[in-house]
Amino acid sequence: SKRRDMTVFSGLFLGGLPPELRSATLKLTLSSVKDREPFKGWITDVRVNYTQTSPVESQEVRLDDEQSRLCAREDVCLNGGVCSVLNDQAVCDCSQTGFRGKDCSEEDNYVEGLAHLMMGDQGKSKGKEEYIATFKGSEYFCYDLSQNPIQSSSDEITLSFKTLQRNGLMLHTGKSADYVNLALKNGAVSLVINLGSGAFEALVEPVNGKFNDNAWHDVKVTRNLRQHSGIGHAMVNKLHCSVTISVDGILTTTGYTQEDYTMLGSDDFFYVGGSPSTADLPGSPVSNNFMGCLKEVVYKNNDVRLELSRLAKQGDPKMKIHGVVAFKCENVATLDPITFETPESFISLPKWNAKKTGSISFDFRTTEPNGLILFSHGKPRHQKDAKHPQMVKVDFFAIEMLDGHLYLLLDMGSGTIKIKALQKKVNDGEWYHVDFQRDGRSGTISVNTLRTPYTAPGESEILDLDDDLYLGGLPENKAGLVFPTEVWTALLNYGYVGCIRDLFIDGQSKDIRQMAEIQSTAGVKPSCSRETAKPCLSNPCKNNGVCRDGWNRYVCDCSGTGYLGRSCEREATILSYDGSMFMKIQLPVVMHTEAEDVSLRFRSQRAYGILMATTSRESADTLRLELDAGRVKLTVNLDCIRINCNSSKGPETLFAGYNLNDNEWHTVRVVRRGKSLKLMVDDQQAMTGQMAGDHTRLEFHNIETGIITERRYLSSVPSNFIGHLQSLTFNGMAYIDLCKNGDIDYCELNARFGFRNIIADPVTFKTKASYVALATLQAYTSMHLFFQFKTTSLDGLILYNSGDGNDFIVVELVKGYLHYVFDLGNGANLIKGSSNKPLNDNQWHNVMISRDTNNLHTVKIDTKITTQSTAGARNLDLKSDLYIGGVAKEMYKSLPKLVHAKEGFQGCLASVDLNGRLPDLISDALFCNGQIERGCEGPSTTCQEDSCANQGVCLQQWDGFSCDCSMTSFSGPLCNDPGTTYIFSKGGGQITYTWPPNDRPSTRADRLAIGFSTVQKEAVLVRVDSSTGLGDYLELHIHQGKIGVKFNVGTDDIAIEEINAIINDGKYHVVRFTRSGGNATLQVDNWPVIERYPAGNNDNERLAIARQRIPYRLGRVVDEWLLDKGRQLTIFNSQATIKIGGKERGHPFQGQLSGLYYNGLKVLNMAAENDANIVIEGNVRLVGEVPSSMTTESTATAMQSEMSTSVMETTTTLATSTARRGKAPTKEPIGQTTDDILVASAECPSDDEDIDPCEPSSGGLANPTRAGGGREYPGSSEVIRESSSTTGMVVGIVAAAALCILILLYAMYKYRNRDEGSYHVDESRNYISNSAQSNGAVIKEKQPNSAKSSNKNKKNKDKEYYV
């Protein structure tokens, strides 16, 4: 029966059945027992489940204790005879002992019918010799049965064994489908019997432990002919063989052979302890010979008794002994397990000579998913075929683990087979027994008891292996090794980590522990144990490495960290690429792979660029990673057409990630296994794909980064890479670090090691009239632009391309801020780049501008990002040339309205990426204009802390720098020359400057500086007065030897004084005064700045906050109200005269005055040059000549410096006022703004760089300059020019009542026609031309949609004033 378990529903009856079971209505499973006669006689030694038991109930049975008494003595029955009591006497049953006699003490050595096997009397049992032999794996007995074949229906096999090995053949006879096989299998006793039509298999295992415990165990196998009820529709009884196997007399398994074959016939050999090829024996569950001791191996049947152990020792002519056998029990060296602790460890075994047949068996145990366990290959042979390229082929054999599954790989020259040995994963930490057997083209691979057959393709039956057989991995120096593409673990550098034991090759044991010691193999431990603690619990992976528990080790995935090493402790090398750089790995031999593991980290600001590619010199094969529109694109092309595949579908592509050109580190991983592809970026979900076609082999000679140099088979060349690469690992090889450390000598590179700022192909536009024209920008559906720039200019056109209809794109600098202007057909749009400060700081800045297919526009400047979505048209249809750096002079007038530029870009551009194209701005130019040079030297001299003397302000310019000496009292290029100096003698004198009646300024902020020396205790140095009747004034004076200032701007007198500095000591002193509204500062020489804040300023702050929330259309009304408030509280109205010397005030000054500066006017210079508006009277004398700082070379700079001043200096009062509330005071920065240009009342609030129009305002500020520190502040002199003379004002007031309606209509008309006037700013001259200015109060501006003027700077000044 095939069923091993029996279900029992009744008691166990001995000797017969009770009457109730004989009822005719009761159906029994075996109905014939009802008709059997009850047993009469003795039944002794009753055991159930191996234990003695007592009956529960009996009928007509006498329980006799006499047997226990008579059989109690140990010497009643010897040699295992069974004692029973008959007629009150002890009787021995010797039938199962091989002995005879009353007490089973006489050896039964007569065998009927086989006279040659008759043996003499061996004496009594006590003197009986035991026949023992020791087998060490290569020895065995072979008894020839050819002269006396066995034909039996009942037989018995007995033997005893002692071993430490888990597997081994103990006995075998028969061949083909008629055999008996007894073996030790994984520590259990295995019996396989086949009588011609099917095998009976039994496996006896101990309850605890294994039989390979180095103790003696007795095995007995019996086979008897019995009648057995058939199962099925026939329901007939047949004669079957009952088979019983017992170990140590208590472990018994019973079953029946299949069908009705009852005879065992054998004319072959009896093998004991092994065979010449155990793996090839029919039915053999093991492939190796026995290692240990065998005792008293006996086979007997009705006709013959073969004492095989005795015959071997006595040298029977039919018994052949192979090997040197010791006929005694010796200790056999155990095959100790070993542990491969690292993927790099391995053992080299001798060449496996298994051309026709062979077998390998071993046990393994691991928790790791991947590893090469066994590998060997034959001599390389070149395969040439008209349809195939020349390639190297080898015979090979491999057993590997991939993803937890065990695979057999074999190629005998006619094609490769790859067999998954087991469907379940085998990396669960348990022991698995692997047995590989082959005979020609066919064979099996079995794991534990599950066997998988195979048949190799083609006709070749010879496995020609010529190299060593490697166990556990491969040597680091793989020169001379040929790795077939099908052996993925070899190409992926996956060494095996785990335990191996009991390695047998062709039935011969291999002491791999001893081999490891001889080879001094690192990372091999002569034991196997599994640690219970999980290694990752201690967080061994540093720098955010991802930990995985391996076999008694932790495994760190460092691919996303930028570090290398077992614990991610070593920083990985960075390579910097500038678009002309590369690293190329030229492999020593052509590689063919079917599986790849690729990982790398990159950082780039470009949306396009090649990251890594494998290339071939002979095919289009490639595995390529590149940036494509900010995403990672994987392309795999296996050149199926070239090798004549039938189902080529072209390259496979996968995309992953988004906006990866953000100048941050990103990690890319690629895993290919045959046709399966997986692409991962950072921690995002993996993208997967399946390759079409039957071809899976990738050929490559090179691994390239930065630039693809092998372009012969490329239909299109990817853009060069600009950025940084790190941790490039291809199939376990960290190539960047291998190249840097000199570990490999096949690197070629010009990329630079280390993290470096990338400035690729810089070009200098030396003048604002310089520009280049390139081919039309291709940005129809989407766009990715990138460039770097460096400049000191506030304004300039960087990029311009026009197109069909109104389509265009512009990138420009406006007041130091970047603007992106475009029109896709729905009207022009402006996006202002975000930056903390103006970008004209002579530093490199990175700019990325993109537009995706959903019309999401992104502007990124360094790390600041601005986005905006637009509706409507989605395509940018450009047609004409692309201009870089500017356009022709006559084209500025026709630029779109939102474009501010009136001149070109002066400075450097680099790393220009035009939607994936890297143009050479000079070589690729259709034409060039002006001075354009390669490289970027920048200003030959730059502003340093000590560039300008005496607290002069350094102004960086592209061709150098200049010094603003306005507030120093000195002059000259570096503010270290004396300023214009007058001496006021005894009796006093005075220099008076008078503004023209129609040009008297009103200011919110004033700046005054002068140098002097005197010994007076009382004197007036400078006084500024307003027009008659207004009463506003400002006076710089000496009182009791201390310098001070008094001023009145419409309310009360305000005074500020430096009380600590003695200034009437005859030494030269410089005094600086600033005013912003009612706030004021005063500084003498290098003494700390004195600050003064009148009460009520919080009102202005609250008004400034409220002003930002005032509706757009009400802006003008509020502006006028705020202006009126300003006239009362903060504005120095209608300034008329500047009087120097104080003669009129009764305290004439005596001493020296130098370098007077007031709101852009250098009055002493003007006096020395005989200015018509200056009157000199009294004892005043010019010292020397006018300083010659106004040379021809520096006229423009000097004028600009004299007419302008630091932006933030004018707001020192404001800044320091907030400092008293806990904010840091503001230094005087580098910057400039024109002083004497008209500015409007408080304008609509906006961002600093905003140039959007608001409600009608007055003209603009020429040459606005930003401070290096951030927000824009009021200029040195915010001037409100009087629109008419005082007489005109009187007439206007008188006529106001009569002309009220007319004035209102006129104002409305002017508001609705804001584009009547325009102005042009010339930075080098500081003047306003083409100004449509009547004799009114303000200069009108163009309407909002026209090109904007720079008056926005003045708007911000008003806003900053209120803050």
From Swiss-Prot:
UniProt protein name: Neurexin-1
Role played: Neuronal cell surface protein that may be involved in cell recognition and cell adhesion. May mediate intracellular signaling.
Glycosylation site list: N49, N646, N1079
One Gene Ontology term, aspect cellular component: membrane
Entry keyword annotation includes Cytoplasm: no
Organism per entry: Gallus gallus (Chicken)
Stretches the record annotates as Disordered: 1244-1280, 1330-1363
Protein modification: N- and O-glycosylated.
Family: Belongs to the neurexin family.
Binding positions for Ca(2+) per the UniProt entry: D178, L195, M263
Extracellular side: 1-1287
Subunit structure: The cytoplasmic C-terminal region binds to CASK. The laminin G-like domain 1 binds to NXPH1. Specific isoforms bind to alpha-dystroglycan and to alpha-latrotoxin.
Gene Ontology BP annotations: cell adhesion
Subcellular location: Membrane
PROSITE patterns membership: ASX_HYDROXYL, EGF_3, LAM_G_DOMAIN
Underlying gene: NRXN1
A GO MF term: metal ion binding
Domain Laminin G-like, chain residue ranges per copy: 132-329, 336-528, 574-747, 761-936, 982-1180
Residues on Cytoplasmic side: 1309-1363
Residues passing through the membrane, by range: 1288-1308
Disulfide pattern: C71-C83, C77-C92, C94-C104, C293-C329, C499-C528, C536-C547, C541-C556, C558-C568, C908-C936, C943-C954, C948-C963, C965-C975
